[in-house]
Curated annotation (Swiss-Prot):
The gene is iscA. This is Iron-binding protein IscA. One of its GO terms (molecular function) is 2 iron, 2 sulfur cluster binding. It comes from Xenorhabdus nematophila (strain ATCC 19061 / DSM 3370 / CCUG 14189 / LMG 1036 / NCIMB 9965 / AN6). It holds the Pfam family Fe-S_biosyn. One of its GO terms (cellular component) is cytosol.
Amino acid sequence: MSISLTESAAQRIVAFLDNRGKGVGLRLGVRTSGCSGMAYVLEFADVVNEEDQVFEDKGVKVIVDGKSILYLDGTELDFVKEGLNEGFKFNNPNVSSECGCGESFHV
C-alpha cells in the first residue's frame, strides 16, 4: 500500500503546515458525495488515530483512515497551477470514472 507526493505537493503541504504552526501531517480520505459517488477529503491532522495508516514521502506524513485506504492505494498527490487556478490534483489508479465537473469519482 502506498500514497506518494510530487515535489510540488510536498512543498505546498510543508508551507501550509508551517503557516498553521501545528499538525503532524495531512489527512487524506474519501467520503460519499457528488454525482459519481465519492469525493476526496483533505484536512490537517493534529493526531494519528489507532486505525490510521501513515505514509511518509519527501518529509511529509500523509495519514489515511482504514476505510479510505481501499480507495486511495497507489494515489499520487500533486499540486498544479493552470493559468489563474491552482490546487491539489489526485492521480488515483483506482478510479474507473469521474464526473464532468471533476469533483467526484467512482472506483
